[in-house]
Amino acid sequence: MLPVALATVCTGPITYKGEDTLQRDLENFKSALGRVNVEEAFVPSIAPSMIGRGQNKYYGTEQEYRFAIAQAMKTEYKAIVDAGFILQIDDPGMGETWDMMVPHPTLEEYRKLQAMYVEALNQALKGIPEDRVRYHLCWGSWQGPHLGD
């Protein structure tokens, strides 16, 4: 029997956890790269819009919730760039969520939501040089037809 997935629920202020693990991973990656000939390397990190797709029971609005997530992720984004890597923002949600939302939003509602996600991401990237960031938009991967791509 497969384990039951538990929905995430935000019940308090969002903070970044895992700085030590992140630093260890960045140091290990840097060490591994020291043994090969590369000009530059990137480290992927998830977009704020992909985190916290569960229930928000703490923040007053969806926008407050998303911006709190973005602020927490700024810690990770900055650490990646400070370690000398290019930061790759992975954001499958921009493309894949359109046909998964229930109830299905209008195109105007979807664009408004995605604009808010972009604004939150821009807040998280504030102060990080543009030439140290790349954005990866994909259509996600799931076991079903991609009818809305």
What kind of region is each of these model predictions?
Residues M1-D149:
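Domain-level signal for soluble alpha/beta catalytic cores
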